Amino acid sequence: MIPNEKIKSIYLIAICGTGMASLAGLLQKSGYQVTGSDSNIYPPMSTLLQSSGIDIKPGYQRKNITQNIDQVVIGNAVSQDNQEVLAVQEKGIPYISFPEAINKFYLKNQKSLVVTGTHGKTTTTGLLSWVLHSAGKKPGFMVGGWMNNFDGNHAISKGDFFVSEGDEYDTAFFDKGPKFLHYNPFASILTGVEFDHADIYRDLEHVKDSFRNFVNIIHTDGFLLS
């Protein structure tokens, strides 16, 4: 994996998804040159990206993948036969998934606070971010919804904490494990577990297994609220 200090240009495939657009905003605020593509370009995410000066290329085209790209982030909805993915692989450009990118760029040297559960993640993540902000902790966060309090859905940490939503859905076409296993949780809020995502989980017990795996990687000095 390429060291962060050697990365200047980052390209996001499927940049207009809620999480990917938030990540793009974080990366740009961190000083990286950020571009990306999507086949579904529409508000509010397209407006957010364009207002930040991030170039969005419509559709997925091989010509978009150039050698000056240092790192590619591939969204969950992107398939293995995507034309840009094929170009990335042919050119040997390093690529990672969305949750891997969060870990790589924003969870190092931070206490990772992960809100997970079948329902209520976005609301709870927003509340936790606001509580920490109000307490003067200056947390980083990435939330799957727009927060009027912050006039945004992401922020770079200026303290010890980064708050994120832990999704049990699979990571990418090249990583079928749950996203939340990439977040190195120091502590977590678990809102509840129900059967969901019938396209990848057999039954409720299968879903519970994923959450058990997540709980088992919480830091030994951390905690779980449920």
Q: Model-predicted segments: where are they?
A:
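N-terminal glycine-rich dinucleotide-binding loop that anchors FAD/FMN and/or NAD(P) in oxidoreductases
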Residues: 51-61, 160-163
